UniProtKB/Swiss-Prot annotation:
Digests double-stranded RNA. Involved in the processing of primary rRNA transcript to yield the immediate precursors to the large and small rRNAs (23S and 16S). Processes some mRNAs, and tRNAs when they are encoded in the rRNA operon. Processes pre-crRNA and tracrRNA of type II CRISPR loci if present in the organism. It holds the Pfam family Ribonucleas_3_3. GO terms for cellular component: cytosol. Its EC number is 3.1.26.3. Gene3D superfamilies: 3.30.160.20, Ribonuclease III domain. Homodimer. CDD domains: DSRM_RNAse_III_family, RIBOc. This is Ribonuclease 3. One of its GO terms (biological process) is mRNA processing.
């Protein structure tokens, strides 16, 4: 176990003062369901996940606020959601192959189990929580920010041109184009609001704006957010609640 932890420390570039925190970050709850006696001396990683989620949101919020002083709240909120999405965190975890360090039950440790997005995202959150407790906020920030620096340009591209991005993804995945329609026009002539809908893999996403173009972009952005969150699969989109 100590060799595995040392290998992970080298991979992430952080040496823990308290290695039990690092070990706990990779203790999946399923292991304790299968072997409850382990609870006598070990703890699952769910509390660290909870803490890490908060640290990630705080660090991400402050970094975006400081890095993009001219952007409004809505834009920064969209970018933050993309950075800390399950898919985004899973991609961060995959860079260090965090799944291989997880302690899982036999049922969870099946082919492909260690590469599941939800598992990887949870492990990344727990690792951030462990780093914060062991090293403090500045070390946690230094660990997190490089991931965002590497990803933000792509996220900005998606956010600034969502209709083009959605079209590219639909053509690549389903060999078809998004289907847009006007759902509603409301308000007085001088303050008109438009509601546009886009249908993606059988699911409808709506967006509103002061022009048809703006509403179309809002609908595309909402579809992309749902698609990215669920790994861009038709099944996941079909399961996505229409209110999202």
């Amino acid at each position: 176990m100590s060799d595995r932890l040392a290998e992970l420390e080298r991979a992430i570039g952080i040496t823990f003062r308290d290695r039990t925190l690092l070990q706990t970050a990779f203790m999946h709850r399923s292991l304790f369901n299968e072997q409850p006696h382990l609870l006598n001396h070990l703890t699952d990683n769910e509390r660290l996940e909870f803490l890490g989620d908060s640290v990630l949101h705080f660090v991400t919020t402050t970094w975006l606020f400081e890095t993009f002083p001219d952007q409004d709240e809505a834009t920064l909120t969209n970018w933050r959601a993309a950075l800390v999405s399950t898919k985004g965190l899973a991609e961060c975890a995959a860079q260090f192959n965090l799944g291989q360090y997880a302690y899982l039950s036999r049922g969870e440790d099946n082919p492909g189990g260690r590469s599941r997005q939800k598992l990887l995202a949870d492990l990344f959150e727990a690792l951030v929580g462990a780093i914060y407790l062991d090293q403090g906020l500045e070390t946690a920030r230094a660990f997190i920010v490089p991931f965002w620096q590497a990803r933000i340009e792509q996220i900005i591209h998606i956010d600034l041109d969502p209709t083009t991005r959605l079209q590219e993804l639909m053509q690549a995945r389903f060999k078809q184009l998004p289907d847009y329609s006007i759902e509603e026009e409301r308000g007085p002539e001088h303050q008109r609001e438009y509601v546009m809908a886009v249908t993606v893999a059988g699911r409808k996403f709506t967006g509103s704006g002061s022009s048809k173009k703006e509403a179309k972009r809002a609908a595309a952005r909402k579809a992309l957010a749902a698609w990215d969150k669920h790994g861009f699969t038709a099944t996941a989109i079909d399961a996505q609640d229409e209110r999202n």
